[in-house]
UniProtKB/Swiss-Prot annotation:
Belongs to the thioester dehydratase family. FabZ subfamily. GO terms for biological process: fatty acid biosynthetic process; lipid A biosynthetic process. It comes from the Bacteria. It is found in: Cytoplasm. The gene is fabZ. This is 3-hydroxyacyl-[acyl-carrier-protein] dehydratase FabZ.
Length: 153
């Protein structure tokens, strides 16, 4: 288990996402092959808040799910770095998604994802995103790794 701080540069070495779609700010803890704890700091300056909703900004649920999927992709990367680094990790499916609490500007989203199953390049994760100790979202997500060149076919 690693609780050493993980730099943004290292996060970016596993994830191809960049602003405004890189939704993980920090990794708090990683247990290879088991789980990851990550943080997304929610800022009013994020572009989606201009229209969702102008008088009552709420982080879109699909972006909470995307942050959870990115945390899962990072767990895959730390579990098997040789087969994930330099690959694209594609979001394949969402199951059992439930939204329990709105996520607002100023909140810190604490994301915990657990590896449920892996079969070659297909990964299944389960987890939750929490705000102030309360579950904001829970879901299972599936992802698949592919070489970057194969992704354009």
């Amino acid at each position: 288990m690693s609780t050493d701080p993980i730099s943004l540069q290292e996060i970016m070495s596993f994830l191809p996402h960049r602003y405004p779609f890189l939704l993980i700010d920090r990794i708090v803890e990683v247990e290879q092959g088991k789980r990851i704890l990550a943080i997304k700091n929610v800022s009013f300056n994020e572009p989606h808040f201009q229209g969702h909703f102008p008088d009552h900004p709420v982080m879109p649920g699909v972006l909470i799910l995307e942050a959870m999927a990115q945390a899962g992709a990072l767990l895959a990367g730390y579990t098997d770095p040789d087969s994930v680094r330099g690959q694209l990790v594609y979001f394949m499916a969402i199951d059992k998604a439930r939204f329990r609490k709105p996520v607002l500007p100023g909140h810190q989203l604490n994301i915990e994802m657990t590896l449920l199953k892996r079969r070659r390049e297909v990964w299944r994760f389960g987890g939750k995103a929490m705000v102030d100790g309360e579950v904001a979202c829970e879901a299972e997500v599936m992802a698949m790794t592919r070489k970057r060149e194969e992704s354009h076919e």
